[in-house]
Every structure is written in C-alpha cells, then in structure tokens.
C-alpha cells in the first residue's frame, strides 16, 4: 500500500436529483471501507459513484463496488458509475464485470 491509500477519501453531495459520491485515491483494503462509509444509507435517490480520480483498485475495491451496488438494489435505489478511471475499467474487464455496472454522465449541480 502506498501513502496515497492512507489519503483515500470519498464524499457525497446531492446534485440534480442524485447523490454523487466522489472517490479520490487508491480503492484498496484501506480505501474500500471509507468508500462504503460515504454512501448514503437511507432514501431512494439514485447513487452515482464518480471514480475518475481512483488511481488504483484491487479486489477489496472491487468488492466495495459490488457491495455498494447490492445495497442500492436492496434499497430500491438506482446505482451507477460515472467516469471510471482506466485502472477501474481494467479491473472490471479483467473479472468480466464491466457489464454489471451502469455507467452514466456525472450529474451537475
């Protein structure tokens, strides 16, 4: 793990009828719980996860994306990725899961 992992952050904001969660840093064993903690736990507003600034993702990060998606499905709220980085796309394609995630444009304020 690099120093960037220790500075992973994710924050949520409401934009255009969706909750936008912006993730920055390495989505790994340290970052994955931080990502999940940033997700809203109530409501039915769609969740859009902006991954443009994720420079690395390992299996822990992949698991957090799957957990976030499932939590949204269970709550009846739409879930989508926005601007996934090359590194994120590479992992999703490697494990043949890219088609499991809807990819949308980033909501605007």
What are these regions (language model features)?
Residues 1-56, 66-109:
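STAS-like cytosolic regulatory interaction modules
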């Amino acid at each position: 793990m690099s120093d960037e992992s220790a500075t992973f952050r994710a924050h949520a904001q409401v934009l255009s009828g969706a909750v936008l969660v912006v993730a920055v840093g390495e989505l790994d064993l340290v970052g994955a719980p931080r990502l999940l903690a940033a997700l809203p736990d109530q409501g039915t507003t769609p969740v859009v996860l902006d991954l443009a600034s994720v420079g690395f993702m390992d299996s822990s990060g992949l698991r957090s994306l799957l957990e976030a998606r499932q939590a949204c499905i269970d709550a009846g709220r739409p879930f989508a990725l926005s601007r996934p980085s090359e590194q994120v796309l590479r992992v999703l394609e490697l494990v043949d899961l890219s088609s499991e995630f809807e990819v949308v444009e980033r909501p605007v304020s």
